[in-house]
Amino acid sequence: MASDPTSGSTPHLPPDSLAWLTWGLLASLYFVGYFQRVAPAVMVDELMRDFSIAATLLGNLSAIYFYTYAAMQIPSGLLADAVGPRRVATAAAGVAAAGIVLFAQADSLWTAALGRGLIGASVAVAFVACMKLAGHWFPANRFATVTGVSLLIGNLGGVLAGVPLSEAVASVGWRTAMLASAGLTLVLAAVVWLWVRDDPSERGYASHAHPEALNNAAMSPRRSLKMVLSERDTWLLFFAGGLIAAPVLTFAGLWGVPYLVQVHGLERSHAAVFTTTMLLGFAVGGPLLGALSDRMGRRKLPYLGASLAHALGWVIFLLVDDLSATALTLLFAAIGFSAGGLIIGFAFAREVNHPGAAGTVGGVVNMAVLGFAAIQQSAMGWILDRNWQGDMIEGARIYDAAAYHAAFLWLAFSAVGAVLAVALTRETYCRLRFDSDD
């Protein structure tokens, strides 16, 4: 018979199995969000034909998800701090399902854009809620590791939106595939509401949260946001996260597949394998680099090393022609893996801010991750259209290697910017500055 966690004078901390299950169910919403984020990459031709659009408008349609996602990051963090991740995530999953249905049944570009916007705005809470929940269910010295696993789970959604979704689109059409994902999202909303709890104390266990984090009601949203935005390192980590993530989300999330199809002559499903490799590297890099940072007791050094490797990867991609399939696969995996270092930035940002503002700081940093990706996706489309030579196949524009090269230059510039931002941060040695200042 299992022992009562409340027996004795002091409740026990929650068992790892319960912590991972509770947190993992909520993290499933991040899986859904990531799937929806990169899904347009394998339906580029269908979307261009159905809505009669070129690259600029397609980039904008895909990027609307990122714009609304980014816009909701700070509100999501404030809500997670104020009312808890369970309520926020359940409501978000329901709204996401509605947005997916609207997108799948759209008969105009504007309706499709509204659907994509609803999806982005609703799943925006997922990552922030995961970080908020992790601070209550796991010890502080595992925060970067758990946050890294969030990235792994999310990227598995991206993997599902690669070859499997490509095959589903070819088999039943993009609209039916999207409707099926809406149904699964509704099921997830019910499961999160029934099982997830914001703090172990709701199940009779002791909490891992800092005492200040348990008194969120005493801190107004305005004060929380002011404290976070007044911290210098918050801004450096804001730019670092956005600039390192945007190239991967832009390439693997939208323009990588059409580039490989149009320039290298690959089949769409084969091209999706290459971009999926980048997402898999991203997925694996998050938890491994997060765990390395936790083990080293350092944040700046491993984050800087990952940022340098990421920038080098994009420079090689742009400068080295005629890479073999094997070399390109390894390069994409390395680019994705090194980008996973952005996970360290979330733990880093949490440590330089007040523990009662954990949700808010997560929202601020994550706003850059998605906001910068939105800007880059739209900018890539604009650059491609500016360099279009007039070729079309079955109603879809075809862009040559020079056009893509002009667009992809900005991926390398972005990665170099991330290196500079991380280099200017101050090390925390995996300790909360709030405690250090007491």
Residue ranges: model-predicted function:
Residues 82-93, 294-308:
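Cytoplasmic membrane-interface "Motif A"-like loop-to-helix N-cap segments
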Residues 8-15, 199-238, 438:
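Juxtamembrane intracellular "pre-TM" segments in multi-pass secondary transporters
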Residues 94-107, 308-322:
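C-terminal ends and interior cores of transmembrane alpha-helices
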Residues 52, 84, 105-111, 139, ...:
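Helix-breaking motifs and short loop linkers at transmembrane-helix boundaries and internal kinks
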